Amino acid sequence: GTGTLVLRSYSPTTICIDWKGGGVAVESYTVTNDLTVCEVTTHAGGECAIYAYEEKSPLYVFSTNGIKMKDVDLTNMKSLVLVNLTNSGLTDVKLPDSDDLAELILDKNLLTDIDLSRYASQLRMLSLNNNQLTSFDASNMQNLLSLAIANNQLESLKLANPDMYNLEA
């Protein structure tokens, strides 16, 4: 199949993505501050990893839709502000080690649990629609403005977000 990849960077850079894992399907993308939109061939069950030449890559938008993956590792993408992994079939995700991550979209996956405590003070928008979550605690996310968590199997949802203006549950 195919899926959509959207990338954006503060300054020109090259991003390498191993779509299958094991270094067998590595593709390079030249990214600038203009949105880079690509249709990519998907590899179901792949363990996707993203790499950059710079230690602190200037990539700040990483967005996929319909790219099926077993796993994705974004830990080295320390400048990411927006991560969108929609309709990927993910049961787990390794998020960036970033103090800048403000928007996280993980809709239409197979997540049963997710620990976002690392990002509690920085997330502004979070979307976890159409997963398999049974409980979620957003009470420590004091800066969260929008939470979309509809179409899960929620039995428990904890909120204490004084500035939240949008809730879809």
Mark where each language-model region is:
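Hydrophobic loop/turn residues within beta-sheet-rich immunoglobulin-like superfamily modules
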Residues: 43, 53-55, 75-77, 95-98, ...
